[in-house]
């Protein structure tokens, strides 16, 4: 079976592999100073990984059949995982700012978003808006914490800026003939996830052995 949207699908699969490896590496780290907070970062890496896998399959093999059951299931997986990834980032920001009301605010957006996805909605604009909410919260938290002298947040800030740059590429529709905006976004997002991994390691800490 030929790949339909090769640039998008292959870069989605690349992002899937990168985030899966990062999640597994983080899961295996021992002697963490904050072991109870590891789950929220694992949630980020594994949900991005799963949504990328679903996206690669959808774009690569079912983009010509958007009304098919398989395509709808794949998009449901993407939507739900984007929601959980946004939750994970907002959770870290809220805990850092000691303001868990941010999670309540997020839930106001997430509940109708999940209901929309479960009812078969597949307008990616809603998905992008949810992701943007998490990025904005995380961006301002990163700037605030870094300016306070928390150097671990430099990696978080760079990861957030990379992801926002990727979003701009998609919105402005910057791309090449055989390598479109979505493919470029996936590559930039992969770089952003590497920065998030660096941040996660510093945030969780590790006792010397």
Residue ranges of each PLM-predicted region?
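Conserved phosphate-interacting/catalytic interface
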Residues: 53
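Polytopic alpha-helical membrane-helix bundles and their juxtamembrane interface segments
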Residues: 1-47, 56-209
């Amino acid at each position: 079976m030929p790949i339909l949207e090769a640039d998008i699908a292959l870069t989605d699969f690349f992002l899937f592999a990168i985030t899966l490896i990062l999640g597994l590496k983080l899961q295996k780290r021992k002697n963490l100073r904050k072991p109870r907070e590891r789950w929220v970062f694992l949630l980020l890496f594994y949900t991005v990984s799963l949504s990328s896998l679903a996206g690669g399959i959808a774009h690569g093999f079912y983009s010509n059949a958007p009304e098919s059951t398989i395509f709808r299931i794949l998009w449901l997986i993407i939507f739900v995982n984007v929601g959980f990834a946004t939750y994970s980032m907002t959770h870290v920001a809220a805990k850092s700012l000691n303001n868990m009301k941010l999670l309540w605010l997020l839930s106001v957006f997430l509940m109708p978003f999940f209901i929309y996805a479960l009812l078969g909605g597949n307008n990616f604009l809603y998905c992008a808006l949810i992701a943007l909410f998490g990025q904005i919260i995380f961006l301002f938290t990163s700037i605030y914490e870094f300016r306070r002298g928390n150097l671990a947040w430099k990696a978080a800030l760079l990861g957030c800026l990379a992801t926002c740059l990727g979003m701009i590429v998609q919105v402005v529709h910057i791309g090449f003939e055989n390598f479109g905006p979505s493919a470029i976004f996936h590559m930039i997002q992969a770089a952003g996830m590497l920065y998030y991994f660096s941040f996660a390691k510093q945030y969780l800490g590790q006792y010397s052995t």
